[in-house]
Amino acid sequence: MNKLTVILPAAGKGTRLNLPYPKEILRLNKEKALIDSSFDLFDGLPRNKVKFVVVINEEKTEIVKYLAKYKSQYDICFTYQNPDEIEYTGAIKSAKHLFGENNIVLLPDTLLTLPKGVSLAQTVQHHLNKYEFAFLFKPETDKQMLMTKGCVQLDENMRVLAYEDKPSDNIFKFNGYWCSFAFKKGAFDECIAFMEQSTLKLGQPKLLIEQTPIFKSKSIEVEDFKDLGTWEEITKILSQS
């Protein structure tokens, strides 16, 4: 199995929570902070099989200190987000020089759960042997939820037919939203350009999904996904601890 590079975009300002420290190190319990959930997905994987790349800004260097606890377990590197780049797409683009051949983006302020016994690393590597891109998605049909997510339209074989970030029209054609995505290094530029034009609402798209490896790539269904970017969601999780 090739080494998998895990990109964690953690350069957001976290204005919804207004914490005095990076939201990624918000404690969920005595042992774990939010960002630990991303590392837990690779627990037991040897150092030579996974590398972590964390994208930060100058106000979030506390993350570097917090993640030092993994220094004997994993290769971890940090890079600043290019100030000329914006949104999560800009954070990921800022880490391009650190990509491996096989890569996965995880959002470090979320909790992603896979079916019991499923290895994220093995599943992603298997998909990237066949496809250049793969969304990890959660099925969803609620209109209000879809309006806040990066939405996908999948066929009966979980292949991607359409994508739009936070759609306002034709919402009911979508049947899920992405929670993470994996890609081959060589496919990155086309895929991120397509996704970014939707995220930034640049108007008439210059790049169609059919022109990218995203089109008809097979997606991976997750068991559950929680975005902890709001106090409402955090309170729900803390009440279950």
Where are the predicted features?
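N-terminal glycine-rich phosphate-binding loop and ensuing alpha1 helix
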Residues: 1-63
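Conserved beta-loop-beta/alpha segment of the NTase-like Rossmann-fold superfamily
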Residues: 63, 68-155
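Active-site glycine-centered loops adjacent to acidic/histidine catalytic or metal-binding residues
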Residues: 12, 109, 230
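Short beta->alpha linker loops
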Residues: 30, 58-59, 83, 223, ...
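Catalytic-core segments of class I nucleotidyltransferases/pyrophosphorylases
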Residues: 121, 125, 157-241
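A structural signal for isolated positions on well-ordered beta-strands in alpha/beta enzyme cores
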Residues: 5-7, 51-53, 77, 104, ...
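Conserved beta-strand termini and adjacent loop/short-helix elements that scaffold enzyme active sites
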Residues: 55-57, 79-82, 136-138, 163-166, ...
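Phosphate- and divalent-cation-binding pockets in alpha/beta enzyme and binding domains
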Residues: 16, 62-65, 227, 236
